[in-house]
Structure formats: C-alpha cells, structure tokens
C-alpha cells in the first residue's frame, strides 16, 4: 500500500486545496464516501475502470453517466485526470487519502465500527454518543461496516483503542480463560 499511498497523496492534496478554495471540502468528503461505496460494491465497475483495454475516453463517458451530475466539478475533474493518466487503479487510495487529510485538517477522529448485523438508526445514534464520549470530542466520523463473523455485538476501533463487545470476542476470551485455568 505504500506505493499506492505515494501515488494517491499528490492527487488527494490537490483535491483538498481546490475544495478548500471553493469552500466545498465537506461536500466533497461526503461525495468521496459515496464514490468509495460504489467502487467497493460494484466489482464490474471497478474492473472496467482499471482495465487497460478500455480507452480513457470510454472510462470518462462511463464516469459521467454514472456520477457526472452527482459530484462537484472538482471531483469530476479529478476522475477525468485519473482516467487520462491511467491512474484509476489508485481511485480508492486517492479517495481514502483525501478523507484522511480532510479529517486531519478538521480535527475529526475516525472511529471504525464493525457490527454483526446492520444497526438501526436508534442504535447508530446511541453508539455515536458513546463513541463521541470515548473520543472526548463531538467531531467523530463513524465508519460502519457489517461483519457476520462477529456473531453478535460490535467492535469499535478508535485510534489505537479497540473495544470488542462482540459475541465472538467473548467466546475467544472465555476460551483463553479456560485454557489458563487448566
């Protein structure tokens, strides 16, 4: 990943500078999250965008049809530059790096929450309050994901701190305790 990071950083920094100047950093951060969701959810789209067989113009047309009206000109221009330079392979790295730089700049803490199943809005709100209390700030960006291997409960990662409130974690800890006792 260091190679992709070194490739992604200049693009992400340039996007951040442009969006700051235009006063659209927060909007673009939200758009980056949406684009990452599309990228991660659609293997066919991802494969087409990184394919060396597909011409850059065809990739740009596909991008315009998919997201052209839904993103700011700053983001769409970045996508066109990545397509022209055959750098769409680093698309997710650029988006993630932008979000990282944006959070650093805004003093926002990232909390990653994995749950065994999708959380309701009430559960998300309650969890958000707990995570904000743990972080000691209201500026927390929560990244929710579903991980059925947890069986039940959730795991919160906040910086170097990990809170494992999952059923699989409890079973693992119980197994370790039993192994020590015998």
Swiss-Prot record:
Which GO terms of the cellular component aspect does the record hold?
A: plasma membrane-derived thylakoid membrane; proton-transporting ATP synthase complex
Q: Which keywords are on file for this protein?
A: ATP synthesis, CF(1), Hydrogen ion transport, Ion transport, Membrane, Thylakoid, Transport
- What's a Pfam family in this record? OSCP
An MF annotation (GO) of this entry:
proton-transporting ATP synthase activity, rotational mechanism
Where in or outside the cell it occurs: the entry states:
Cellular thylakoid membrane
Q: Does the keyword Transport apply?
A: yes
Q: How does it sit in the membrane?
A: Peripheral membrane protein
Q: Which domain of life is it from?
A: Bacteria
Subunit field text: F-type ATPases have 2 components, F(1) - the catalytic core - and F(0) - the membrane proton channel. F(1) has five subunits: alpha(3), beta(3), gamma(1), delta(1), epsilon(1). CF(0) has four main subunits: a(1), b(1), b'(1) and c(10-14). The alpha and beta chains form an alternating ring which encloses part of the gamma chain. F(1) is attached to F(0) by a central stalk formed by the gamma and epsilon chains, while a peripheral stalk is formed by the delta, b and b' chains.
Q: Which HAMAP family match?
A: ATP_synth_delta_bact
What is the protein name given in its UniProt record? ATP synthase subunit delta
What organism does the record attribute this protein to? Synechococcus sp. (strain CC9605)
């Amino acid at each position: 990943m260091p190679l992709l990071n070194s490739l992604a950083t200049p693009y992400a920094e340039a996007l951040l500078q442009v969006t700051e100047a235009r006063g659209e950093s927060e909007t673009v951060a939200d758009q980056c999250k949406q684009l990452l969701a599309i990228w991660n959810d659609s293997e066919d789209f991802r494969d087409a965008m990184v394919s060396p067989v597909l011409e850059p113009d065809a990739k740009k047309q596909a991008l315009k049809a998919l997201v052209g009206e839904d993103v700011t000109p700053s983001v769409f221009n970045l996508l066109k530059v990545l397509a022209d330079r055959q750098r769409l392979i680093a698309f997710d790295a650029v988006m993630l790096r932008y979000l990282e730089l944006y959070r650093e700049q805004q003093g926002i803490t990232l909390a990653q929450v994995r749950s065994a199943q999708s959380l309701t809005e009430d559960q998300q709100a309650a969890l958000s309050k707990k995570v904000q209390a743990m972080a000691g700030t209201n500026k927390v960006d929560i990244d929710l994901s579903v991980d059925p291997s947890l069986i039940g409960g959730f795991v919160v990662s906040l910086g170097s701190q990990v809170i494992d409130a999952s059923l699989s974690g409890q079973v693992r800890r119980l197994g370790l305790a039993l192994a020590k006792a015998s």
